[in-house]
Amino acid sequence: MSNEQNLTEEQISEFKEAFSLFDKDGDGSITTKELGIVMRSLGQNPTEAELQDMVNEVDADGNGTIDFPEFLAMMARKMKDVDSEEEIREAFKVFDKDGNGIISAAELRHVMTNLGEKLTDEEVDEMIREADVDGDGVIDYSEFVKMMLSK
């Protein structure tokens, strides 16, 4: 099995374990039915069409089921998404100068000015308002994540 996804041996064996939880009959492939059973046991309630879409998304050979290499490729892709989460966290720290977990208008103005963006108070307030879901006048981490992911 080639490891083009740069996964560690440990990750591969964890994914193998997860795969066998899905692969109820142990035939080496996950059907939409098996996927549904696991999803429901995790408190999800996917429709038949959603399950089919999920399988189709990773079913590289088009045989209607997910085999282990396809499962591995899907997990590796998900792991890459985690990197972007780390990048968002780093970006948040840049703005959150005092490290109190929120970005104030002053912090936002400071960073934007350092980036060469001369903004008026109104423009800074507008940026805060756009990202400030709960209306408390500052941007917390979850609001920052939402803003970054909606770009």
Swiss-Prot record:
Question: Which residues are Ca(2+) 2-binding?
Answer: D59, D61, N63, T65, E70
- Residues in coiled coil: none
Keyword hit for Calcium:
yes
| Keyword vocabulary terms for this entry | Calcium, Metal-binding, Repeat
Residue stretches making up the EF-hand domain: 10-45, 46-81, 83-118, 119-151
Task: Give the CDD domains listed for this entry.
Answer: EFh
Which residues hold Ca(2+) 1?
Answer: D23, D25, D27, S29, E34
- Quote the record's binding site residues for Ca(2+) 3: D96, D98, N100, E107
Q: GO molecular-function annotation terms?
A: calcium ion binding
Q: What does this protein do?
A: Calmodulin mediates the control of a large number of enzymes, ion channels and other proteins by Ca(2+). Among the enzymes to be stimulated by the calmodulin-Ca(2+) complex are a number of protein kinases and phosphatases.
Q: What family does this belong to? A: Belongs to the calmodulin family.
Miscellaneous comment as given in the Swiss-Prot or TrEMBL entry: This protein has four functional calcium-binding sites.
Give the protein name, as stated in the record: Calmodulin
Q: Which organism is it from?
A: Pneumocystis carinii
